[in-house]
Amino acid sequence: MSPNSKGVEILSIGTELLLGNIINTNAQWISEQLSQLGLNHFRQSTVGDNCDRIVRVIQEISKRSNLLITTGGLGPTPDDLTTEAIAKSFNVTLFERPHLWDEIKQKLPNSKLHEDSSSLRKQCFFPKNAQIINNPRGTAPGMIWEPIKGFTILTFPGVPSEMKTMWEETAYDFIQTKFSDTYSFFSNTLKFAGIGESSVAEKINDLLNLKNPTVAPYANLGEVKLRITARAKNEVEAKNIIKPIKEKLKQEFSKFIFGEDNDTLPSILIKELTKRKQTIVFAESCTGGLLSASLTSISGSSQVFQGSIVSYSNELKHLLLDISEEKLAKYGAVSEEVCEAMAINVKKKLRADWAISISGIAGPNGGSQNKPVGLVYISISGPNNYITTIKKQFNSTRNRLEIQTLSVNVCLNSLRLILLSDSK
């Protein structure tokens, strides 16, 4: 986009967004796409399903931007008002595109067409000169339309899978050709575990003021990310700009960096175990299967993950994991002694190379003075009778799911570090 351009705006339409019923992932995804295209994206708006309000917002945007991208409000229901509101904003008539009705009829069963033909048909009406954006995944097409000189509107349905497909198949090339200049933004994200955001930021203070590339830290629960973004003519040039900063960070934080971009702790652990042709099992108590779910959510986990025993009660710890009643009575389920026995025994029972066990108090109830909420024991059992136990005391003000999620991250990262040290 040229230096004199007014920029791009995103307009998200839907009362459900204002009520907080759904998270606006569409705007986030489109923002990333615009950044990759090197476009100036300065503002986002959200408006409910009210035609007059949508009209007012569109008219305001048309005075300050070159390109408007809308999501939501396309479809057959009475509250799908986007196309109607756009037409009203510029005082134009909507015309039916008969071929679109033919396409809708092919996508839906006859019974549905008979019941809702009039409401479904409203999806076929567009301004006279609008270019249609086909929707391979649904019935609601979008459009590319320039209602006034220097201002273009692209419309998409609110369903993320439909919007993304339409963007990738039609809109991306159009925007790149018409609006993108010779420079684009390229980002590379480094992911950290076992270190806090403030500790990372403190060590990279000199990098935070860079202009090209820029370096920005941000945190999710249990991990820190550093996004390095370069403005360049192509990806090769961008990689060359990013490379020295990336190498400096890897030297500074070697063991804390577990991956890049789309990597996750589960995917990295699966990769490392697959490389070694080793298997893993779990014995879970306070996480209730969350550790197992983190691994099985990744394609390819079956190559390394054998299974798990979720033994929430003391009775099942005794019956399924052979933890003696005497040990449970003496030390309690949340203890180093019981957690170690869980790891050793599940590894033996399920015949794996590695085992992780976890037992703790996730809260908000169940804590005591000696064993407060947030206390978690994690044991890792491995080849050659290897055993180690990690004791964590998470902040008791965290909610139950946060403590469980942080516990899972510690499990995965701890084994990652063990494998890393073993390979040296």
Curated annotation (Swiss-Prot):
Matches recorded under SMART domains:
MoCF_biosynth
As recorded in UniProt, coiled-coil segments are: none
CDD domains noted in UniProt: cinA
What the entry lists under SUPFAM superfamilies is as follows: CinA-like, Molybdenum cofactor biosynthesis proteins
Any matching Pfam family: MoCF_biosynth
**Gene3D superfamilies assigned:** 3.30.70.2860, CinA-like (3.90.950.20), MoaB/Mog-like domain (3.40.980.10)
InterPro entries attached to this UniProt entry:
CinA, CinA-like_C, CinA_C, CinA_KH, Competence-induced_CinA, MoaB/Mog-like_dom_sf, MoaB/Mog_dom
The record's listing under PANTHER family reads: NICOTINAMIDE-NUCLEOTIDE AMIDOHYDROLASE PNCC, NMN AMIDOHYDROLASE-LIKE PROTEIN YFAY
Protein family per UniProt:
Belongs to the CinA family.
Q: Which NCBIfam families match?
A: cinA_nterm, molyb_syn, PncC_domain, PRK00549.1
What name appears for this protein in its UniProt entry? CinA-like protein
The taxonomy runs: Bacteria, Bacillati, Cyanobacteriota, Cyanophyceae, Synechococcales
